[in-house]
Curated annotation (Swiss-Prot):
The gene is DCW1. It comes from Candida glabrata (strain ATCC 2001 / BCRC 20586 / JCM 3761 / NBRC 0622 / NRRL Y-65 / CBS 138). Residues 389-408 are annotated as: Disordered. One of its GO terms (biological process) is fungal-type cell wall biogenesis. This is Mannan endo-1,6-alpha-mannosidase DCW1. GO terms for cellular component: extracellular region; plasma membrane; side of membrane. Its EC number is 3.2.1.101. Belongs to the glycosyl hydrolase 76 family. Residues 1-18 form the signal peptide. Keywords: Cell membrane, Cell wall, Cell wall biogenesis/degradation, Glycoprotein, Glycosidase, GPI-anchor, Hydrolase, Lipoprotein, Membrane, Secreted, Signal. PANTHER family: MANNAN ENDO-1,6-ALPHA-MANNOSIDASE DCW1. It catalyses: Random hydrolysis of (1->6)-alpha-D-mannosidic linkages in unbranched (1->6)-mannans.
Length: 446
């Protein structure tokens, strides 16, 4: 490894055992992230005999697999490296389930709304980044995203707390009485991205509906600093807020608002984007990203150790979509990427990544979440150097169906009977649960 001066190390380069990263040198970034991506894929077991395509080794749950494939999509796009594209394609298609809505039978009794959502976010990402389309006889990326959105929207529960999604789909699962932010924030987030991709106003209406409910029950603050909290219980009519703050929840609301501003040009969504960005400062110390709720006391569980990955991804997309956020976000991403690179100096391979990026070396922590977080923060330093998310009017070529996911299904709260010709975008779902169909009928079918 070459020696570097203190000044250059502070600005753009870090050199450590096993991993060298120079943010001013794209080849250096490609080489460094290739090592991190390889370490991430070390946890993938779907190619092994008797294992399930798309799944990672224990103890990593199904939802985190969806998050990991989203991470690998970012790696492909920003690093222009298609090494793992066949695995990404196979995983995203294998886990769709019989109804192509990411409720596969092997997960259907334990799956929560948030679990399903992270696969929906991954396929939305595939559509927006123009990842190679599936074969013609397979569901397309936009279709799969719409199916996830529609099945989640059907579970909107107006009978308790005036609305909102429950955490769990089935009554027998722990957490059924909890309406958590990640489920509702993900519904908002997916609606916002579908709105921008399709131009369909009914998705905007849905995003506004979810946002207003979350604000009404105080899951999100209203002001110039909009902090995002964990959830509420229906047992006290959603009056007591669990005030844990997680990076991925903040990111869902931040980037969802950015998508809506980019689509609508609305001052309201511009203001909200900046308010969520202001509140995001709680997750940085000297511009280095950390999971504030658990990292200090060293109590982060397996899931929580991956949250920074999604937040870094959502920061990158926000910077792409809202120019005024770029200076702050890129300062955070660049500083955090260099810090993360220092942590990727552990293990027998010399480039296993850790959890704590404040150190100048590996902290002894390792796992899928650590690799994901380091990879996402590194590749998103390039967020402004590639084309922003595509949509149906600027080069996006994924096809869908506004009625996707509305086939009668045991996970839906009520069976639906919709003919094949009923394809008026997301307005179908809006109409089913009481929103006007008049405006929705004017939109194109995707």
């Amino acid at each position: 490894m070459r020696l570097v001066t203190l000044l250059s190390g502070l600005v753009s380069l870090v050199s450590v055992f096993g991993l060298e990263l120079d943010l001013d040198d794209y080849a250096s970034l490609q080489n460094a992230t290739a090592l991190v991506a390889y370490g991430l894929m070390d946890y993938y077991t779907g190619d092994q005999y008797g294992k399930t395509v798309g799944m990672f080794s224990d103890p990593y749950y199904w939802w985190q697999a969806g998050g990991a494939w989203g991470c690998m999509l970012d790696y492909w796009y920003f690093m222009q490296n298609d090494t793992y594209n066949d695995k990404i394609m196979a995983a995203l298609l294998h886990q769709t389930g019989d109804n192509n809505d990411y409720v596969p039978l092997n997960q259907s009794t334990t799956e929560g709304n948030d679990d399903q959502a992270f696969w929906g976010i991954a396929v939305m990402q595939a559509a927006e980044r123009k990842f190679p389309n599936p074969p013609d006889d397979k569901p397309q990326w936009l279709y799969l995203t719409q199916a996830v959105f529609n099945t989640m929207a059907l579970r909107w529960d107006s009978e308790t707390c005036g609305g909102g999604l429950r955490w769990q789909i089935f009554v027998w699962n722990s957490g059924y009485d909890y309406k958590n932010t990640v489920s509702n924030g993900a519904l908002f987030h997916i609606a916002a991205r579908l709105a921008r991709y399709t131009g369909n106003q009914s998705y905007v209406d849905w995003a506004e509906r979810v946002y207003d409910w979350m604000e009404d029950v105080h899951l999100i603050d209203n002001g110039t600093y909009r902090y995002v909290y964990d959830g509420v219980s229906i047992n006290d009519n959603c009056t007591t807020v669990t005030k844990y703050q997680w990076t991925y929840n903040q990111g869902l609301m931040l980037s969802g608002s950015a998508y809506l501003f980019n689509m609508t040009g609305s001052d309201l969504w511009h203001e909200r984007t900046h308010a969520f960005l202001n509140a995001s400062r709680v997750f940085f110390n000297n511009s280095i990203l950390y999971e504030a709720a658990c990292q200090g006391p060293n109590t982060c569980n397996t899931d929580q150790r991956s949250f920074k990955a999604y937040f870094a991804r959502f920061l990158g997309s926000t910077a792409e979509l809202v120019p005024e956020t770029r200076q702050q976000i890129m300062t955070w991403l660049n500083t955090s990427a260099l810090a993360a690179a220092k942590s990727c100096s552990g293990g027998t391979d010399g480039h296993t990544c850790g959890l704590n990026w404040f150190r100048d070396d590996w902290d002894g922590m390792y796992g899928l979440g650590e690799q994901m977080a380091a990879l996402e923060v590194m590749v998103n330093t390039q967020a402004l150097k590639r084309a922003p998310p595509y949509n149906a009017t600027n080069g996006g070529n994924s096809t869908g169906d506004g009625a996707a996911g509305t086939k009668p299904h045991p996970t839906n709260l009520a069976p639906l009977h919709i003919t094949g010709g009923s394809r008026a975008g997301a307005g179908i779902i809006t109409a089913i649960i009481g929103i006007s169909i008049i405006a929705c009928a004017l939109w194109l079918v995707y």
